Amino acid sequence: MENSNLFSFFVPLVGLVFSAIIMVLSFLYIQKDSVN
């Protein structure tokens, strides 16, 4: 039961981290493109 609760907490957290990483990568890509 506790494992399932941890899993239901972990999945949205991974999604949030994943979207944050994508935002940072796209931001860095735009910065690099504007510098060039």
UniProtKB/Swiss-Prot annotation:
<keyword id="KW-0603">Photosystem I</keyword>
<protein>
    <recommendedName>
        <fullName>Photosystem I reaction center subunit VIII</fullName>
    </recommendedName>
</protein>
<keyword id="KW-0150">Chloroplast</keyword>
<feature type="transmembrane region" description="Helical">
    <location>
        <begin position="10"/>
        <end position="30"/>
    </location>
</feature>
<keyword id="KW-0793">Thylakoid</keyword>
<dbReference type="GO" id="GO:0009535">
    <property type="term" value="C:chloroplast thylakoid membrane"/>
</dbReference>
<keyword id="KW-1133">Transmembrane helix</keyword>
<keyword id="KW-0472">Membrane</keyword>
<comment type="similarity">
    <text>Belongs to the PsaI family.</text>
</comment>
<comment type="function">
    <text>May help in the organization of the PsaL subunit.</text>
</comment>
<keyword id="KW-0602">Photosynthesis</keyword>
<dbReference type="Pfam" id="PF00796">
    <property type="entry name" value="PSI_8"/>
</dbReference>
<dbReference type="InterPro" id="IPR036357">
    <property type="entry name" value="PSI_PsaI_sf"/>
</dbReference>
<keyword id="KW-0934">Plastid</keyword>
<keyword id="KW-0812">Transmembrane</keyword>
<dbReference type="GO" id="GO:0009522">
    <property type="term" value="C:photosystem I"/>
</dbReference>
<dbReference type="InterPro" id="IPR001302">
    <property type="entry name" value="PSI_PsaI"/>
</dbReference>
<dbReference type="GO" id="GO:0015979">
    <property type="term" value="P:photosynthesis"/>
</dbReference>
